[in-house]
Structure formats: C-alpha cells, structure tokens
Amino acid sequence: MLTGNEVWVKVQQSLRGNLSKPSYETWISPTTFCNFERGELTLLAANDFSSAWLTNNYSRAIEEAAEAVIGESVKVIVKVKDDIQKSEASLPPRISIPAFHPPGDSKKTDSKPALNLRYVFNRFVVGPNSRIAHAAAMSVAEAPAKEFNPLFICGGVGLGKTHLMQAIGHYRLEIDPGAKVSYVSTETFTNDLIVAIRQDGMQSFRDKYRAADLILVDDIQFLEGKEYTQEEFFHTFNALHESGTQIVLASDRPPNQIPRLQERLISRFSMGLIADVQAPDLETRMAILQKKAEQDRVRLPRDLIQFIAGRFTLNIRELEGALTRAVAFASITGLPMTVESIAPMLDPNGQGVEVTPKQVMEKVSEVFAVTSDEMCSSSRRRPVSQARQVGMYLMRHGTDLSLPRIGEVFGGKDHTTVMYAIEQIEKKLSTDPQLASQVQKVKDLLQIDSRRKR
C-alpha cells in the first residue's frame, strides 16, 4: 500500500504529463505533501496566494489524478506551509446552520451549510458609500428586532450586501451560540418550497423557516414574478415579524423597484429601514485594497494601490479581483509590484498583448480542460463547443488573424461559424459570471506568457 507521500509523488508525475510546463513548474512542483488521511490529501503551498490559486484552479485536477492512483475518491485541502496554526487561529470558528430536509428524507446526511468565515464586521471597510448600511447592520446585530425590522439592504452587485448580512449572523452567534440563525438565498427558499410541495412537507418547511431567531434572506429580487413563492414568503414574513424575529433582506434594488412584486410585500419590506450601499469612492477603494493586502500579507506601494483603485471603480468584487490578478502576475513572472510592471496585466481589454494562435489554444485548453484536437474537431459537446467559441473570440481580439484564417486554425470551420462564436461569447460575458471568470483567466495566462517571452 502506498504511503501518502508516495501518492503525491505519483500525482505529480501524472500532472507533469497533463499540464503545460509553466503551469506545472509554477504551481504543482513547489507544492509539498503534508498528510493523507480518511480520503483527504492535505498539501502545503508557499503562501496564502499560492494556496488560494491551487484550490481554485488545480484542486479538481489533483483529485482526479489521486483517484486514478489509489482507486478511491479523494478530497484535496491546500494549506500554507509553516503557517498553518497562525492562519487557522486568525479566523473565527466555523458556524454551521442546519439544512432543511423534507419528510421522507431522513436518510440523507445533514450537509450543514455555513456562513462565510471572512464575512465579519472587522473585515468590512466602511466608507461614505456604506456608512448607513453598516451602522444599521451593527444595530440589528447588537439588538435584533428592536429598531430596524426588517432591515432591507440594497445596492449593486459586489458592493458588500452579502458581507454585511452574514456579518450580522456571525455577530449574533458569537454573542449567543445557541441562537437559531438562518441565512438563505431566495433561490434556496424557492427550491425548498417546491420540494416541500412535491413531498407533502409544507409543515416541515414552515417549521424550519419560522423557527429562526434571526433570518437573513439574500437576493430577494428573485421573488419577481413567482406568485406562489411570494404568497408563502408573505405568510412566513408575517409569522416571523409577529414573533419578534429580526428579518434582514438584501436586493440589488429597493422594494418598490422590483418588478412584479406584490404590493403587500413591497409595503412590508419598506416598513423598517431601507439602507442603500453605493459604489465606493476613491479613498474607500484604496482602503479596501490596503486591508485586503494586509489580510493576504502582501506589501503594496501606495502608487500601485492608487492606480488599481483609480482603474476599477464599479464594485468591490472587481477591485479585489484586480488585486488578486496583480499579485498572481508578479508572483509568476518575478516582476516587482510596481505600476509599470502591473499596468499591462490590468488592461481590461488586453491591449498591447501579442499572442499567437498556438498560445491561445494552449491556454484555452488549460482553463477549459479540453484538448486542442477536440476544439478542432466537429464535436458539439457543450464543453468542447464553448471552449472552441472562446478560442475563436480570443483569437479575434488578441491576434491579427482574419475570420477565415481563424476558421482554418480550428479545423477548417467556416468564417460564419467564427462570427457566430464571437457574437455568442460577447453576449454571454455579461450574463454568465463563470464564463467571464474563465475568459479572464485565459487572458491573464496569455498576459503572463507574453511577458515571459519578452
């Protein structure tokens, strides 16, 4: 029987043959074995960033390689070398909330979804854009159902609504570990309702949602047009409010701007406090970057912080994503963390990057886990066709190839097929966050590859 370290050696050998040489040498080779127990393979990365990158981008490939070696399911955990105890001690304890299981489902294990460990008040940067929402969140966390009930937090994507909501939950459970805190998305509420109806479990559904001491409901705008869900939510809201339960709701817009929302729900959502979260100003964006850099133990020069904060203005998620990409770029290329070095990577349009069709194919293949041969084939499997379309889109925007020439690269496809692919990706980028993230990842890899070869 192989030891854990021997398993990792064989996994590395497998990945060396499946990944590009730069990817293997940058991420897999420096990673060391820590422990293998009860199906969990624990690895050690050099720093916080490497740990996060491995987890987000290579954990599935490692798990598949390990499963091929030992013939059993494997879960990969990546920790930080020489800093495990410190990093674990710096985080608050994981807080679990019981999951809903309808009648007849008792054989299923409780999956215990948890509040995000990072969404606590001391990690939230307060600025003029969020001062009222933050103060209101603190108020209901300290004294639920006393002043603002419900608390309705609204604002655009990535501005911190979910962070504030979950921070309230963490705070309450820290004060009262026995409190019944329920954090749920509107989609989950709807899905639970559908399951309860199908399995004749409405009483269990109501008991589950109405037993909470504090209920946090995210993305309430998705109640739009769901008449039966709105009906049930109305009665749930009333029962909770009358029993003195604190209700916190979050939406991308105020109640009166949610289309096809019942007037009685609009009235109830508006009876407490509506706290708006706006996009952060320059000073707040700089403070957010500085705080994240400190949390990740990364030293950033002030002019680089100001450059990133001035370039990414829409929301916090975009801002922090830019910082993550900048740190990755500097880490992989070995370039200093300066505006001059980082600016090309943060060009949202990828301008100034010269790439070849071969590079595009390699990076798309790496990110989408589809081979170049598959992309050049006539396969219509969704993973293959999507990777092919992304490749065509990136070749159009990153090389000087004509549409017919791009079609030739992809196995002799017609130029109209290339045009259609480009149009499809351009449409999906604004509506499919996962695809947008994958495309951005390919662009980042192309940036890194391009700079390496200069």
Swiss-Prot record:
Stretches for region Domain I, interacts with DnaA modulators: 1-84
Chain positions recorded as ATP binding sites: 158, 160-162
Alphabetized NCBIfam families for the sequence: DnaA (TIGR00362)
Species per Swiss-Prot/TrEMBL record: Prochlorococcus marinus (strain MIT 9211)
Family, as annotated: Belongs to the DnaA family.
Assembly, per entry: Oligomerizes as a right-handed, spiral filament on DNA at oriC.
GO molecular function: ATP binding; ATP hydrolysis activity; DNA replication origin binding; lipid binding
Protein name: Chromosomal replication initiator protein DnaA
Region of interest called Domain II, as start-end residue ranges on this chain: 84-113
Single biological process term from Gene Ontology: regulation of DNA replication
Highest classification ranks of the organism: Bacteria, Bacillati, Cyanobacteriota, Cyanophyceae, Synechococcales
Function, in words: Plays an essential role in the initiation and regulation of chromosomal replication. ATP-DnaA binds to the origin of replication (oriC) to initiate formation of the DNA replication initiation complex once per cell cycle. Binds the DnaA box (a 9 base pair repeat at the origin) and separates the double-stranded (ds)DNA. Forms a right-handed helical filament on oriC DNA; dsDNA binds to the exterior of the filament while single-stranded (ss)DNA is stabiized in the filament's interior.
Region (Domain III, AAA+ region): 114-330
InterPro entries on file: AAA+_ATPase, Chromosome_initiator_DnaA, Chromosome_initiator_DnaA-like, Chromosome_initiator_DnaA_CS, DnaA_C, DnaA_dom, DnaA_N_dom, DnaA_N_sf
GO cellular component, one term: plasma membrane
UniProt keyword ATP-binding, yes or no: yes
UniProt cross-references to SMART domains, sorted A to Z: AAA (SM00382), Bac_DnaA_C (SM00760)
Gene of this entry: dnaA
Lineage: superkingdom: Bacteria
